[in-house]
């Protein structure tokens, strides 16, 4: 896991690296509406941006999964931690 010392949004690749997840995992969680990154479009290309609060939630979800919880339970617990 890398440290992010900024209030600026980061790309999906940086978010995945910072939270010890994968880009594929974050995209899947987004399809399930467990996370909702900011989406910015430039022409036909779309970009996802994650803010520090998003990274905290992603990290909590991943930590709960690593402890043996299901994805749904991990999301519920991460949401309750707010």
What are the language-model segments listed below?
Residues 1-19, 31-40, 47-82:
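Arg/Lys-rich, alpha-helical DNA-contact motif
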Residues 22-25:
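Short coil turns linking two alpha-helices in DNA-binding domains
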Residues 28:
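Base-recognition residues in the alpha-helical recognition helix of bacterial helix-turn-helix
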């Amino acid at each position: 896991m890398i440290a992010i010392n900024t209030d600026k949004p980061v790309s999906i690749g940086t978010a995945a690296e910072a939270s010890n997840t994968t880009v594929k995992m974050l995209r899947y969680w987004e399809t399930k509406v467990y996370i909702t990154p900011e989406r910015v479009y430039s022409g036909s290309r779309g970009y996802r941006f994650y803010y520090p609060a998003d990274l905290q939630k992603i990290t909590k979800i991943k930590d709960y999964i690593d402890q043996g919880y299901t994805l749904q339970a991990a999301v519920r617990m991460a949401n309750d931690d707010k």
